[in-house]
């Protein structure tokens, strides 16, 4: 027992427990976010006697007489300042890390009211952010310090909410102050908890499952196995190959496979009961990598498949082999890129509530409420009106929350027990379960003429897609179609194969396969520049695709193509670095916006004038931190002339909001933005006719947009693989003395920047994420196909490790005739970073590396 003070009130704790559990579960102070429970991420920071401390570390019995402060306990003035400063700086994206950042900032500013930028970065070194790249969080802390010193709030720099305005995001306050709800922040009467009994082996056959001891444990409500599933057993994003539960006689495919589910009155009982479920296995040889998977006589990951090949892609145009044979210069290299963990700050969580009609309502953190509805309804064997899904705040995704993780398990337990169920993955489960970035091995050959003009590229790609299909096929396709780079040449051929293994599944990750093949193409182009005797900038400028040019996939690009403009934007900084003798690396990239390649790609939006006299925006598109809600409000303001206060953004749900597809593929700003614009046209017509919002109460205005494209290989004069591409040039400058990065420059063509503040944040965040990909991040898997790293050992960059300067250059190239010309930027920001960094280190050391993460840098782990 211990007595201490929390936010000015004395509390007595009878049961010894981690402080985070007491604050969240008993006091419901949900600004204290649970990101890892391992002392690694910093989302649970509180002040203990004025010192920032991770609440997941101390036990309550050790806190006698201490004074504890959470964000809820800040003064009203402090809350106003941090909300304004973080909003003005653009410091908030998914928001899950932000209350912890605020606490660390207060710990600094209470003792140092005028810190330097370096001191602010050091103060949040124990707080990880995966979205922002820290730049704007540090800006927010310094602005807060300035406001505290001045004693009054300034006016916001922009508040007109037109497209192009640097407005504060609409969700800033709830995220800064921690009262916005992620699923784990939800507590309801009678709520019980769920957990999964997972396989002990990567490949084995289940011989028996005995749940009797677990069922007899006091506090256990139910233990479910495959026989309890009322509908279809398998789920899966595209291919239904992932069993909700593995049944007796069936193969487990990786260590994350579930064989039973436990539902109990609290999480402690869940964990105890899981240990009492007895599973007998026939252990079988596992498939560890694509080489083993492709070997003659290899074990099959799936009984029902004829081979371990999950996907095959062949993309060809012209005569690559002939062009390379006749080229002046030819280079061939083998490249290898690693598995990468998304490491979003919010672990997967779902709260399932029973509906009066016998169905379930799911409160989720995922990238598509409608996809979750489709898969869970199929598993339960119910109609869609018996499976409702509501997005809560989403604490980051980056592709890692496209697949089922906990939603189907929460739905099943709720459906069986008729009780509210919270189902959350531990951080280690999250690291094991959700799909990762594919590791790839790639062989590339490039030929150029004497002027450095690309004549042809030929390549092969092999990816490890792990235990399930997930999005392995589309990722492989995108890796292949974009491997040619954003350049104008005709001869291109690439073969790609994705293999099933018994590793954790791989799927969507920011960049969607392009991050891997871009590393190859851009590295070869840098080598080729040296052979030809021109600069890496010049070789790109000569080859860059321009309006009216033809990409290697056959698509004639339009006037919105802005690659040259991004090259020109970084040219002054590039020339200065070369003049100063700084080691400098450069790389370009392109990335599609939208699904493309002939697949129907719908954006949908419904504007409803509700009883409050305001326009409510409903779309099935998930806002996962990228700022979609703010974008849609700006679209409505711009296209209707209404005031911001007349508009309400509603989070995605499945019973009112129309399906607008997954938040992936950099698509939502374009496709849902255009659908929203079309809905606005109808509303504007009524307003122009003299009607007021009061007159329009109860009226709905629907907009939809189909991004029409052609399938790969379509026999048409101008095959349109994608409705739009984003283009980028990034540059890395090293400090020759320390060998560390002193500046990153990233110029990105976004068409129209709906909110330049958010665009800059996306650029900075993508750059820092891929700095980790290039230099430090790792996802080691042992001989048992088990990932071995904890969250704190993944190699994620921290605030005091980023370069002194990350310059985001927003290039606006008009020409796109939808969504006001806006192109999504979520993915491309992370694509050219690694090859730019790799070339900078070659310029420093004279040694070129073809595998990631780079080994010969000051960032590499000490041997």
Question: Which functions belong to the PLM regions below?
Answer:
Residues 226-227, 381-386, 416-421, 450, ...:
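C-terminal catalytic domains of large/alpha subunits in multi-subunit enzymes
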Residues 145-310, 330, 416:
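Flexible, low-hydrophobicity surface segments
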Residues 90, 165, 171-177, 307-350, ...:
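Glycine-rich loop/linker segments at domain edges
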Residues 258-259, 264-266, 418-466, 673-694:
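Phosphate/diphosphate-binding loops
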Residues 397-418, 422-424, 628, 634-635:
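Thiamine diphosphate
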Residues 1-156, 597:
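Signature of N-terminal electron-transfer/Fe-S-associated modules in redox systems
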